[in-house]
Regions:
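Phosphate-binding site of ATP-dependent enzymes
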Residues: 168-226, 240-250, 267-268, 274-276
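Active-site nucleotide/adenylate-binding loops and adjacent lid/helix of ATP-dependent enzymes
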Residues: 100-190, 209-211
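Peripheral (often C-terminal) accessory segments that flank ATP-dependent C-N-forming ligase machineries
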Residues: 304-392
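Conserved metal-phosphate-binding beta-hairpin within the catalytic cores
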Residues: 203, 253-289
Length: 392
């Protein structure tokens, strides 16, 4: 029995499908009884709990004879890293705590990137005692504001009643200072980065024994929110493109000592040929359904290398695919239509393109699958229930 933690999203669902299609018996965990992955035909047992892992996982491992555990959310990865060695013969297929800490900390990630020759955005880490106004006045705008390690600050922000923002943008020193003042009571401030032009490019690698055994890459076509967030529509990019950068991505992961799956995320400017490192996702990433549909199966590769002990490269012939996360993608087009600052022609072209993509034979979906349709209908039912609760 293999346990997949985090059946609540298309990421967990994709991991379930990859392993289940190869005949592995699966137990899935989700935060709620309506977790997306519980409806998959591949799931033999489901556990709904949001309690700390140490409170329920050891008993579950013993009860079901779990052979291996996979997870993707950062809070699960951190908890599982602490449990390594405490679950008997069960294999915990997550990074060790030290390397995970490196990829979660953007400053440490950028330092490793600089050592292997990867360009990183100019950045400023505000600290107590600095003259923020003077520093802000010296920056080039716009800038992106993000926490170098969100897990480190989540509890401190919550204690002050502040939301954890994934990323914010400022077009001027005044806007930046207003954002930074929000965190004065916490005594901690997010990282400020110069904005990098171009398009989102993700390079995905599975590392084993210091080398990549599987590679894939994609570019973002749309995201939600439009200013930067989750990839709502993306496209596979052939591996004969961006080859030199892929080699650098592998060198970066080797420099860190990474083992397992990771996405190295860039902003790529085709006009100049520049690549700027944004971050490393040291886990199964949000757009992994695209890799799955294109034939790059990273969850299976993790199991194949770590459990079956097969270390040969397994680069398949990849299909030309696009993948769509329908609800966020719909929110994207609604936001574009409502943005009166955009020319009407641009909004109309975006709408026509959005609708035409439903007829594109290359397009697959984050949730819907003819081979495993129940998660889609379970998700629709959950959406209806939430809407009814809001209306009552």
């Amino acid at each position: 029995m293999i346990a997949v933690l985090g059946a609540d999203s298309p990421i967990g669902l994709t991991v379930i499908r990859e392993l289940g299609e190869r005949g592995l018996p699966l137990l899935a965990q989700g935060k709620t009884p309506q977790a997306l992955g519980r409806y998959s035909k591949h799931v033999k047992h489901f556990v709904g709990t949001s309690a700390p892992i140490a409170e329920w996982l050891p008993q579950l491992v013993a009860q079901h004879g779990i052979e291996a555990i996979l997870a993707y959310s950062e809070h699960h990865l951190l908890q599982l890293a602490a449990l390594k060695g405490a679950l008997g013969d069960c294999r915990v297929l997550v990074p060790d705590a030290g390397r995970l800490a490196t990829v979660l900390d953007k400053q440490r990630t950028f330092a490793a990137a600089a050592r292997v020759g990867i360009s990183v955005p100019a950045s400023w880490s505000p600290a107590l005692g600095e003259n923020f106004a003077e520093k802000a006045a010296a920056l080039a705008y716009p800038v992106a504001i993000k926490w170098p390690d969100p897990n480190d600050v989540a509890s401190a922000l919550a204690a002050q009643g502040l939301d954890l923002e994934k990323v914010e943008y400022a077009k001027s020193a005044q806007e930046l200072l207003a954002i930074l003042r929000r965190y004065d009571a916490v005594g901690l401030w997010p990282l400020v980065q110069t904005w990098c032009p171009g398009q989102g490019l993700g390079q995905m690698l599975h590392m084993h024994g210091g080398r990549a055994t599987l590679r894939f890459q994609h570019k973002r076509l749309r995201e939600w929110p439009p200013t930067g967030g989750v990839s709502s529509f993306c496209e596979a990019v052939p591996l004969d493109q961006h080859q030199a950068q892929m080699d650098l991505s592998e060198a970066l992961l080797r420099e860190i000592g990474w083992e397992g799956p990771a996405m190295v995320e860039y902003r790529h400017d085709p006009a100049t040929g520049s690549y700027w490192l944004m971050e490393i996702n040291g886990r199964f990433w949000g757009s992994i359904p695209l890799a799955y549909h294109a034939g790059a199966h990273f969850a299976w590769e993790t199991y194949r290398c770590r459990v079956l002990g097969q270390s040969d490269a397994a680069q398949p012939e990849l299909k030309s695919r696009r993948a769509r996360y329908v609800i966020p993608d719909s929110k994207h087009i609604v936001a574009i239509l409502r943005d009166s600052r955009l020319p009407l022609g641009r909004r109309l072209r975006a709408t026509i393109g959005f609708l035409a993509d439903f007829g594109d034979p290359r397009v697959r979906y984050y949730v819907w699958s003819w081979r495993d349709p129940k998660p889609f209908f379970g998700d629709m039912l959950a959406i209806v229930r939430r809407a009814l609760r809001r209306g009552s």
